[in-house]
Amino acid sequence: MGRLIRAQRKGAGSVFKSHTHHRKGPARFRSLDFGERNGYLKGVITEVIHDPGRGAPLARVTFRYPFRYNHQKELFVAAEGMYTGQFVYCGKKATLMVGNVLPLRSIPEGAVVCNVEHKVGDRGVFARCSGAYAIVISHNPDNGTTRIKLPSGSKKIVPSGCRRMIGQVAGGGRTEKPMLKAGNAYHKYRVKRNCWPKVRGVAMNPVEHPHGGGNHQHIGHASTVARDAPPGQKVGLIAGRRTGRLRGQAAATAAKADKA
C-alpha cells in the first residue's frame, strides 16, 4: 500500500496551530459605542508598523476614552497616505478625509472606501488586503441599505449603518514585484503557512502519489477522477467536465465571462 498523500495528511483530524508568532494583533475598528453612533471620537496615529504575514501595513491609533481618564490603543489597516501624527476621526459626524471611519450612509456615491463592515459592529470584513478598495454604488434610504462594489467586481448590499474607512488600503502593487529567488518565497511563506515548496505529483515516486513514477514525468492515465473517489485516489481534475485547452465556443464564452 502506498503512503498517505499530501491531501490526506493536511485533511481533518489533526490539531491545527495557526502561524501567529510575531503577529502584532488583529486589525479592526473600535468597538461601536455611543460616541461613534452620535458624534465622533478623535485619535492620533502613533506609528505605522509591518505585520508579519500581512501585505498591508498597520496603523496604531491611540484614542482617549470618552467617559474616563484612560487611553485606548487600536490597530487599523493603514490607508494610502496615512502618516505618523495624523489625527483620525471615527463616528457619524466625522469629516470625509482619508483614514477617517464613518458609517456608509454618510458617504457619497462613487467614494472609494476600504475595510467595510458586513454587519453593523463587526469591525471590518471587506477590502482589507494591500491595495484593495470598494466603491459605494448607491444608497437605498427606504430599507436602510447600501450597494457596494467589492475588489472582486461583485456587488453586495450591506446595511447603511456599517462603518468603513475612507481611502484605499496601502501597499498597492505589492504582488507585481517578482520574487526573483527562492529565498524570498521561503521567508514569505514561513510566516504565513506550511504550503511551500509544493512538489508536483508527477515528480514523486509511485508510492507517494497516483501521478508518480515512470521513465519521464507524465501522469500515465486520465487525470480526471470521480467525485466519489476515495481519499488517496482523489487527485487531479475532480469530476472534470472537460480537459485540455479552451478552443472555439468554449474559449469565447470564457473570454466574455472575464470581461463581465
UniProtKB/Swiss-Prot annotation:
The entry lists its GO molecular-function terms as: RNA binding; structural constituent of ribosome
Q: Which InterPro entries match?
A: NA-bd_OB-fold, Rib_uL2_dom2, Ribosomal_uL2, Ribosomal_uL2_arc_euk, Ribosomal_uL2_C, Ribosomal_uL2_CS, Ribosomal_uL2_dom3, Ribosomal_uL2_RNA-bd_dom
Q: Which GO terms describe its cellular component?
A: cytosolic large ribosomal subunit
Where in the cell is the protein located?
Cytoplasm
On whether Thylakoid is a keyword of this UniProt record, the answer is: no
User: Which GO BP terms, alphabetically?
Assistant: cytoplasmic translation
Record's PROSITE patterns? RIBOSOMAL_L2 (PS00467)
Keywords noted in UniProt: Cytoplasm, Ribonucleoprotein, Ribosomal protein
Concerning SUPFAM superfamilies, the annotation shows:
Nucleic acid-binding proteins (SSF50249), Translation proteins SH3-like domain (SSF50104)
Entry's family note: Belongs to the universal ribosomal protein uL2 family.
What NCBIfam families does the annotation carry?
PRK09612.1
Identification of the protein by name:
Large ribosomal subunit protein uL2
